Amino acid sequence: MKSKIEIFTSYIEESNIERIKSMNLLPIFVIRSMGRLEFIEKWAGTPLHFRELAPSKELFREYRAGNIDQVTYFKRFVIELAGVDFQNIILRLENLIDSSGADGICLCGLGENPEESHRSIVSDILWRTGYLEFEPKEV
């Protein structure tokens, strides 16, 4: 049976996180390190922090430094995600929604442009697994 959870994606910025919460969406942080962003560091290491859905630090640094292009970055990130149990990810998300009373979740990553952020890859993979009834959308 397909999951009925609604998944959205968006970027991490303080006012945007507040907007996401006002939509009764649970922010799910898909970044490795949250310590340098004061307004979200309180969620580091909590059930809302899905670091396994973020690029490795090494890969992210290579990309940010300009040592690899976006296509290479995305290809290598997909390879990193090969070991992730996406069915388990969806079960965890469902449990978070059930326990919080939220209407859905929002995968939050860095960068305003979804086409340049790994959150788009994560949401696309979640959709392509066939486990979801509704296609994820950017908000």
Sequence positions of predicted segments:
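Residues lining hydrophobic/aromatic ligand-binding pockets adjacent to catalytic sites
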Residues: 2-139
